């Protein structure tokens, strides 16, 4: 999970996510369909993205994510056409083998640069015993590792509806591509002391799964 926008009231920033399996060879058609429907959209906040799953534990091939602040989700009223979302889904169904799971949640912290500039994202699904303690430890390690991370974005948030068994929260880390992500992991090894402190103070956390996604099409609020 990750955001294509940043807002000061992070607790009010939300996402809604729908997984699906695309028909073979239909990825470009899906991206073009999204461009046709959302390329010139004026969103109240947030936006919409189409993403492809890469490495990891997810069984689906792609997903759609709708972002927005509570009370400001979707297109501006004057930019809205009747049954627009339904029409988009109807056309999208021609390129999809099956729809999968869905979930929704919130962003609790976002640091770094633009996710559009770092579209290769690794997402860690978490089970937290003490979310408050984890956020404190997370915020600290983010600051401690800022020098080597540079402008690459990192976010922390919750699953409030769905998300999976034994999963409550998530962390997302942006990179430019696969090689950049692996290089960042190697650089993180120099923070052995800091990560040991994070582990001791995070309130108890496990990582049931992790995976990567690649942004195929992004239509943020402008």
Predicted regions and their residues:
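Bacterial Sec-dependent N-terminal signal peptides
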Residues: 1-13
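Short S/T/G/P-rich N-terminal loop/turn motif that feeds into the first structured element of a domain
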Residues: 10-222
